[in-house]
C-alpha cells in the first residue's frame, strides 16, 4: 500500500455558541483520499469545516494544511485549497460573470479555460443572475468556482444539495482529473 503524505491535521478543535459546543474534534487526512462527515442537522459538521478554513474562529485547537497552521499561513494555504459551502446564496442580483471576475483575482493559479469548461459542463450562463438559478444550479456554480484554480484539497459542505445524479458523478470524476483530495 502506498504511503501518502498527511495534508490536513485537525487537533482538539473546540468552538462554543450559546446553545452548541463542538468538542475536541481531531482527525488527519492523507493526500488523494475522500473523507466525509456524517451527522444529524446541528451536529457541528459545518462549524468544523468553517473552523478548518478560518471562516469561523475556533476557541481552541489547531488546524494544519500541508504542515502549516491556518491561523499564521492563511493566505498561502487558501491558494492551495478550495471550498464550496452548498449553494451560492449571496449577491443574488449579480451576474455570474461579475462575481467570477472578482473571485478569480484571489487565486494565483486561476484557470480560465477550466472555469469555462465547468460552465459548459454544468450548463451555466455567465450572463445569468444568481437569483435566476435553481438551487442545484447555484451549487454547480459554487463548484465551478471551487474547481477552477487547481486546488490540492476540495472542502465541500452539502456538496450534493439539489444536484442530480449526473452532476454528483461529475464531482467524483473531477477528483480524478485534478488529483484532488476531498
Question: Model-predicted segments: where are they?
Answer:
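Conserved ABC transporter NBD signature motif
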Residues: 61-72, 76-77
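Short hydrophobic beta-strand immediately N-terminal to the Walker A/P-loop
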Residues: 35-37, 49
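Catalytic Walker B motif of ABC-type/P-loop ATPase nucleotide-binding domains
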Residues: 154-158, 163
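Conserved beta-strand
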Residues: 10-13, 20-30, 37, 61
Amino acid at each position: 500500500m502506498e504511503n501518502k503524505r498527511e495534508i490536513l491535521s485537525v487537533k482538539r478543535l473546540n468552538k462554543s455558541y450559546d446553545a452548541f459546543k463542538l468538542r475536541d474534534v481531531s482527525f488527519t487526512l492523507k493526500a488523494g483520499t475522500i473523507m466525509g462527515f456524517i451527522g444529524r442537522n446541528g451536529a457541528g459538521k459545518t462549524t468544523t469545516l468553517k473552523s478548518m478554513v478560518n471562516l469561523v474562529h475556533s476557541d481552541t485547537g489547531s488546524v494544519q494544511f500541508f504542515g502549516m497552521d491556518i491561523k499564521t499561513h492563511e493566505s498561502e494555504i487558501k491558494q492551495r485549497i478550495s471550498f464550496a459551502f452548498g449553494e451560492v446564496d449571496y449577491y443574488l442580483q449579480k451576474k455570474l460573470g461579475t462575481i467570477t471576475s472578482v473571485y478569480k483575482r484571489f487565486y494565483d493559479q486561476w484557470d480560465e479555460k477550466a472555469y469555462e469548461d465547468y460552465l459548459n459542463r454544468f450548463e451555466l450562463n455567465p450572463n445569468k443572475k444568481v437569483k435566476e438559478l435553481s438551487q442545484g444550479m447555484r451549487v454547480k456554480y459554487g463548484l465551478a468556482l471551487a474547481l477552477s484554480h487547481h486546488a490540492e484539497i476540495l472542502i465541500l459542505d452539502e456538496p450534493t444539495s439539489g444536484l442530480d445524479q449526473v452532476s454528483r458523478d461529475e464531482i467524483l470524476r473531477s477528483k480524478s482529473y485534478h488529483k484532488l483530495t476531498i
